[in-house]
Amino acid sequence: YATSATSTPSRYALFTGMYPWRNADAKILPGDAPLLIPEDIPTMPKMMQDAGYETAAIGKWHLGMGDGNVDWNKEIVPSANTVGFDYTCLIAATNDRVPTVYVENGLVEGLEEDDPLYVSYEVNFEGEPTALTHPEMMKMKWYDGHFNTIVNGIPRIGFMKGGQKARWVDEDMADYFVSKVKNFLQGRDKSRPFFLYYGLHQPHVPRVPHQRFVGSTSMGPRGDAVVEADWCVGEIISYLD
């Protein structure tokens, strides 16, 4: 399952059955990267669909969305839905990258028409605060390139403007995705088998677990994030039981 030292190429190999080094783009991607998996190749979720399974992808995706010029205010195609998943609820990249929104079946959840969302990995949008210009807005110090747009008091990689109501709250992400998994399991066609890909967002940086997990270990935010990840898996297994 781990064909590479990083997650995107490993995930690419998992879904396509191909070594990531056969695709020069199978590497850590920006949040606005185009879909990495070609739509015209066999994939694991497509094979599951062909075998009669209902398929879903929930959680961290980071395999690209769209065609390289994403309009986040419309349905995003191509997407995980076009490479074998019947239902999807995802973050486009990682917790530390923009856009900091949930994308459900190709649509940004909670996005308001009068507050459109814009994303750039090249230049900031005029007047938008960053970790370097407005350090007073942060609850976490920037590090290792995380000094661009501030969301939820946390500095991110990349620049983002708008979509205020759609932006996630990091502390709630574990509960959010667990609830989406339960909703899928509850609402699925019980006459069919199912295949669920659940991409854990923890313990990826910035490691901001819910308050109930803060201090649950003696190993700081990373240890607490691991405990939160364990809780997520336990909740889903218990629900299945």
Question: Would you name each region that the model predicts?
Answer:
Residues 1-241:
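Formylglycine-dependent sulfatase
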